[in-house]
Amino acid sequence: METVVNQIKSKLPENLEGLLDLAYNYWWSWNRRATKLWEKIDPEHWWEYKNPVKLLLDTPEERLKELSKDDDFINLYELVIDQFRHYMNPESTWFSTNYPKWEEPVIYLCMEYGISKSLPIYSGGLGILAGDHIKTASDLGIPLIAIGLLYKHGYFKQEIDKDGKQIEVFPEYNPEEMPIKPLTTEKGKPLLIEVPIEDRIVYARAFEVNVGRVKLYLLDTDVPQNSPDDRTICDYLYNAEIDKRIKQEILLGIGGMRLLRMLGIDPAVIHLNEGHPAFANFQRIAWYMEEGLNFLEALTVVRGTTIFTTHTPVPAGHDKFPIAEVEKRLAKFLEGLPKDEFLNLGREGDQFNMTLLSIRTSSYVNAVSKLHSKVTKEMWRHLWNGVPLDEIPVEGITNGVHTKTWLHNEIKKLVDRYIGRVWRDYAELEGLWYGVERIPDEELWEAHLKAKREFIELIKRKIKERNERLGIEEPLPEIDENALIIGFARRFATYKRATLILTDLERLKKIVNNPERPVYIIFGGKAHPRDEAGKEFLRKVYEVSQMPEFKNKIMVFENYDMGSARAMVAGVDVWLNNPRRPLEASGTSGMKAGLNGVLNLSVYDGWWVEGYNGKNGWVIGDESLEPETEKDNIRDAQSLYNLLENEVIPTYYENRARWIYMMKESIKSIAPRFSTHRMVKEYVDKFYSKALANAILLQRDSFKATREIASWKAKIFNSWDKVEIERIITHDATGVEVIVNLDGLSPEDVKVEIYYGVKAEGYAIEKPYVIELKHPQSLGGNRWLYRYEGNALKNLGHPCWHYAVRVYPYHDKLPHKFLLGLIKWKGFFEL
């Protein structure tokens, strides 16, 4: 790699030397002027690769000398370099202003990152979200360090054959041509970390990726010190082989922590983005045990300082492995450690569940939308058996998108002109975006048409490349930029229902072939290599697109990636999203589209439950939150056709003023609320800051608080089975007495409460009231009498009201009162 840097250095003219540092920092990927600068060097090369390191390597020295004398290029270069230096060395940031004494890093771990097309280590929404998260952490000045894996073949490059069958192509990427650098020792040799897997040590090298002010470290086992098989651990993202998948997750979690230690970084607070990296907490527990803590004490520290984000209710998104397979691959790591206690953290019958491990080792758990929070609580409520759903400690922090990455350049220009550049630092301020109203309709429409033209050119280019590869000789489609274009692009997972719009082909034929109001529908997306049902959906869409009545009206393009996504989310008129509720935990593609004034046509699920306001798009089906089944497909398809025929198409063609009004409404309502600036600030305020406070508390005075809390937990676990609410005695509607047997616990170890309110379904209570019972009287023999007098009991006996008493363990140093998931109940009239 050093030779690559030297190669570039040796041919850069002196007045263009700044291009080297710029090329190795992904800041350029969200800066309009910087991408324009790279494009000026070689437009065709930039279109193909979007990789400044490869661009500089491949550009002849003569061309660089020519540019060094080009006044226009030099002026742009100096402007970009000046912006870059100011960004990297700010006087202050949001974080430094709001948390001036915070220096400890937050460690962020994820299996994939979508930073740019030139770093193909992502497959879909999880990776794109992770990329947007760390870009925003950079913008806000958060001391965040990210860890991932470097995949030799990435995910896969998609080709579609003449029959519509997906072909997975796995190109081999050369790290030396990427904007990444290897970490080296003082002697210039590759820095290697040692990761115990099975009965041996596996070595991994590390690469550093600069994402603005944030460091992303990527691990890879393709080094000569490893066996041929171990060298292939990082060959493929989401390797379907159980053996490789477990090893990848050990490498990410345990290896990631060991890399930090080699770099002298203390992982005081960590954020697990999905369950894949959860073995990181095994390593942290082991290290704390080396410092003299027992297992429960070490777990207390680790759990109190870990954040876990779960992204999907779909079972395929929650890794499970046979526990024997996990034990085999952790054999060397677990030597000398209490094996069963470690494995029990993820044990689910004979399976080891990575999500379960993540939850059991995290104090701060969140889903990625408000609806997904409810779904997640229901999905995992057995871990908090008896705790009311609304009190289960799973927060909803709705996803967002990195505005500077996803806002189209033409829209950026308008926003700069009519709102001011301040949005770049304060994208989450809702009042700011009301300035969109100042944009003249004709200017917004022209900017939108430019985005459409760009996307149309991309589609034609992709179709041409495919035709040439397959030897297909036919004219390219003529796509009218003034016609309505509907876009559908995402993973071809069956629950996303790509074929829903194909339910009634006769009706669809009339919709797309109206000569006065033509409609194009453009599909993009990959099916997982092992998802045969998803591949069949893709084949079905392609098959319909080749029917004479749909030819060049419905189109499918290959290899949907970040580059095509950026063009598509701004270059269509309508963004179609029709998953089966509630399986779309959040979804972010619609946010990106809405940000650009593209109108969402979506099922009421995920983020759209919060985003839809009646003026910024349409809802397919109803606004219910009830789960859907396959039986609802016909209903939703009919709703989709009705909306297209009666609202979407007529508005687009007959009421342009209304359409542009909705575009502005979309931008101003979606841009601030669904920005990662809002999202990441929520993580800092709600989770990171509290986890850091816990880290300080738990490690202070040689882990004094840790030992106290762990000792208390052990006492609770030992006595809880025998704790009992023995009796409830009511005195008309004025008072109640409760007798509780606390076994070996004291009243200070628990809270006893009256819980009451209007009955809802089953035993649920709508908007419950809680009264804590205090000052108990000892009855001897571990039995305590709690009393209450007051008017809260006035509805006692009413058939619509329910009263109960509950008792649960309580410690004021726990992050959540229900962290242990223990609670006992007794209804007032139970016999």
Swiss-Prot record:
* Catalytic activity of the protein: [(1->4)-alpha-D-glucosyl](n) + phosphate = [(1->4)-alpha-D-glucosyl](n-1) + alpha-D-glucose 1-phosphate
Q: Which residues carry this modification: N6-(pyridoxal phosphate)lysine?
A: K592
Q: What is its EC number?
A: 2.4.1.1
Pfam hit, one: DUF3417
Q: How does activity depend on temperature?
A: Optimum temperature is 98 degrees Celsius.
Q: Which InterPro entries match?
A: Agluc_phsphrylas (IPR011834), Glyco_trans_35 (IPR000811), Glycogen/Maltodextrin_Phosph (IPR052182), Glycogen_Phosphorylase (IPR053611), Glycogen_phosphorylase_DUF3417 (IPR024517), Pyridoxal_P_attach_site (IPR035090)
Highest taxon in the source lineage = Archaea
Q: State one molecular function term (GO).
A: pyridoxal phosphate binding
Q: Which GO terms describe its biological process?
A: maltose metabolic process
Q: Please give the family membership noted in the entry.
A: Belongs to the glycogen phosphorylase family.
Matching entries from NCBIfam families are given as:
maldex_phorlase_Thcocales (NF041129), more_P_ylases (TIGR02094)
PANTHER family given in the database record: GLYCOGEN PHOSPHORYLASE (PTHR42655:SF1)
Q: What's the stated role of this polypeptide? A: Phosphorylase is an important allosteric enzyme in carbohydrate metabolism. Catalyzes the phospholytic cleavage of maltodextrins with a minimal chain length of five glucose residues to yield glucose-1-phosphate. Low activity with tetraose and no activity with triose and maltose. Long maltodextrins (8 to 15 glucose units), amylose and starch are not as good substrates as maltoheptaose.
Query: Could you give the subunit structure recorded for this chain?
Result: Trimer (at 25 degrees Celsius).
Listed name of the protein: Maltodextrin phosphorylase
Q: Provide the species name.
A: Thermococcus litoralis (strain ATCC 51850 / DSM 5473 / JCM 8560 / NS-C)
